[in-house]
Amino acid sequence: MCERRIINNFFSALFHDLPEAVTRDIISPVKQATDDLPNIVKKIENEIVNKELVPLMEDFFVQEIIDFTSDEFSNRIKDANGNVVNVSWEELNEKYNEDKFFPIDGKLVRIADHLSALMEADISIKHGITSIHLQNGRDGLLYSYKEDEVVNGINVYNLFYDIVS
């Protein structure tokens, strides 16, 4: 991985939930209640970030923070004009693994986000702190990846089941 990709992945993982500092976390079952709701929530989050967080930031890193928090779970690059372009993991590795493309493994950030939620739920359940919602959340994460599905080179199903067993 090029140096910029490593840096971008780190900061994307670190800042991807920044909008929730203002909007609060909306749990996935609520966000996924309708097909349109995730886009509506994302639009509101972006508006609030621009209104309440951006004015508090130094100008020199505002655009990078927006890059890290926008479309955070998509693999993406910036083209020669600075436009964000979604690309496959294969393209990230074969064509865009150079600093000049500002590459980000957004799907890897998503896996890490799910993994941390799974571990939090699983550890709580194993220590007797549980509820039907926590169990359903844990199970939902386990079932969200197919057995033979590989995301950004990772068999997430196997990873998740290895963690909880």
Regions found by a protein language model. Name each.
Residues 1-165:
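Alpha-helical, largely C-terminal catalytic domains
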